[in-house]
């Protein structure tokens, strides 16, 4: 029996030395120390030996079992250490490698031009006002001198939510809302940046776009004040070299009304494809506040006057940055946005 135990010991040690993975080690453990393993069967067979031989063989067999268990633990620890070293080696960081620069965020060009416009008018004493994008028909049309049967309603295709609610087609409703809150106090000097909605969608129109509305109410306000304000605005946005002109126009909420043009920023007024070879670019509409609108707002047109203007922010941005397709603003193309 002692010789058999020695043979099993030598054989197990030889096989264990050849084990090269955790899978092989687990297989070795089952074959030697498992329920039907060699050492387990050896220990079970001791019961058939005589007393003295059983004691000697039992001591040697138990030593073999303990030695094998110790060798298994050491082997397991060695494999775990090797596995850890391999993992650390794979995750090794070369601190001498150059760092990857972080990409910095940028303001959208429409955000940039909106803030620039706001800063210009705030510098002239204006404050920023806001209003709802889902607007009452009353404020969007009627209070701006556009009654239900007025032909000017045909000029704008609107997104109606119900008979009395729609997505505002311009930021002008905030004019009346502000006058209602302020009346009869004067002066009022506000600009209203915001989103507006119309049923247009092509290279120069979008169903959602941005406007900046302006309103000034006070005593003895004249068209000269309007011209001076907007000329200063044009020079600050497009440069002191641009020339400004006004053309008669029509808006229900202003009287008289005008369109303001600037000399073409692409050809400096010489005539090109952008300005249709006229040398001029339309940038906004303006006029003196219609007396009926003043009355809707709670003011006496015999006591106060005012002017208003409105411009498309996309239009200003396209002219300033030389962009020929409005849709580029809404496509979120990083190649386009990274230029600003």
Swiss-Prot record:
GO terms for molecular function: ATP binding; catalytic activity, acting on a protein; magnesium ion binding; phenylalanine-tRNA ligase activity; transferase activity; tRNA binding. One of its GO terms (cellular component) is cytoplasm. It comes from the Bacteria. Binds 2 magnesium ions per tetramer. The keyword Aminoacyl-tRNA synthetase applies. It is found in: Cytoplasm. Gene3D superfamilies: Bira Bifunctional Protein, Domain 2. Mg(2+) binds at residue 255. Signal peptide: none annotated. Its main location: cytoplasm. Keywords: Aminoacyl-tRNA synthetase, ATP-binding, Cytoplasm, Ligase, Magnesium, Metal-binding, Nucleotide-binding, Protein biosynthesis. It holds the Pfam family Phe_tRNA-synt_N. Its cofactor is Mg(2+). InterPro entries: aa-tRNA-synth_II, aa-tRNA-synth_II/BPL/LPL, Phe-tRNA-synth_IIc_asu, Phe-tRNA_ligase_II_N, Phe_tRNA_ligase_alpha1_bac, Phenylalanyl-tRNA_Synthase, tRNA-bd_arm. It catalyses: tRNA(Phe) + L-phenylalanine + ATP = L-phenylalanyl-tRNA(Phe) + AMP + diphosphate + H(+). It is an enzyme of class 6 (ligase). Its EC number is 6.1.1.20. GO terms for biological process: phenylalanyl-tRNA aminoacylation. Belongs to the class-II aminoacyl-tRNA synthetase family. Phe-tRNA synthetase alpha subunit type 1 subfamily. NCBIfam families: pheS. Tetramer of two alpha and two beta subunits. This is Phenylalanine--tRNA ligase alpha subunit. The lineage of its organism: Bacteria, Bacillati, Bacillota, Clostridia, Eubacteriales.
């Amino acid at each position: 029996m002692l010789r058999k135990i020695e043979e099993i010991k030598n054989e197990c040690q030889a096989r264990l030395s050849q084990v090269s993975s955790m899978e092989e080690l687990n297989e070795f453990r089952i074959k030697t120390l498992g329920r039907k393993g060699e050492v387990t069967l050896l220990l079970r067979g001791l019961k058939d030996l005589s007393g003295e031989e059983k004691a000697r063989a039992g001591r040697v067999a138990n030593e073999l079992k303990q030695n094998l268990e110790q060798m298994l633990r050491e082997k397991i620890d060695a494999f775990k250490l090797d596995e850890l070293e391999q993992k650390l080696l794979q995750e090794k960081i070369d601190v001498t490698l150059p760092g990857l620069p972080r990409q910095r965020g940028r303001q959208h060009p429409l955000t940039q031009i909106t803030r620039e416009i706001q800063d210009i008018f705030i510098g002239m004493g204006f404050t920023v006002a806001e209003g709802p994008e889902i607007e009452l028909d009353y404020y969007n049309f009627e209070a701006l001198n556009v009654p239900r049967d007025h032909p000017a309603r045909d000029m704008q295709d609107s997104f109606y939510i119900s008979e009395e609610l729609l997505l505002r087609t311009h930021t002008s409703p905030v004019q009346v809302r502000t006058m209602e809150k302020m009346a009869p106090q004067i002066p009022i000097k506000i600009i209203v940046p915001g989103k507006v909605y119309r049923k247009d969608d092509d290279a120069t129109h979008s169903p959602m776009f941005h406007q900046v509305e302006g309103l000034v109410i006070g005593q003895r306000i004249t068209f000269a004040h309007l011209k001076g304000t907007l000329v200063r605005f044009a020079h600050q946005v497009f440069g002191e070299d641009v020339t400004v002109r006004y053309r008669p126009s029509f808006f229900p909420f202003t009287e008289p009304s005008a369109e303001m043009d600037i000399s073409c920023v692409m050809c400096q007024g010489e005539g090109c494809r952008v300005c249709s070879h006229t040398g001029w670019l339309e940038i906004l509409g303006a006029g003196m506040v219609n007396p009926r609108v003043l009355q809707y707002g709670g003011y006496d047109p015999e006591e106060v006057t005012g002017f208003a203007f409105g411009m498309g922010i996309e239009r200003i941005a396209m002219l300033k940055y030389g962009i020929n397709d409005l849709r580029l603003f809404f496509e979120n193309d990083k190649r386009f946005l990274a230029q600003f």
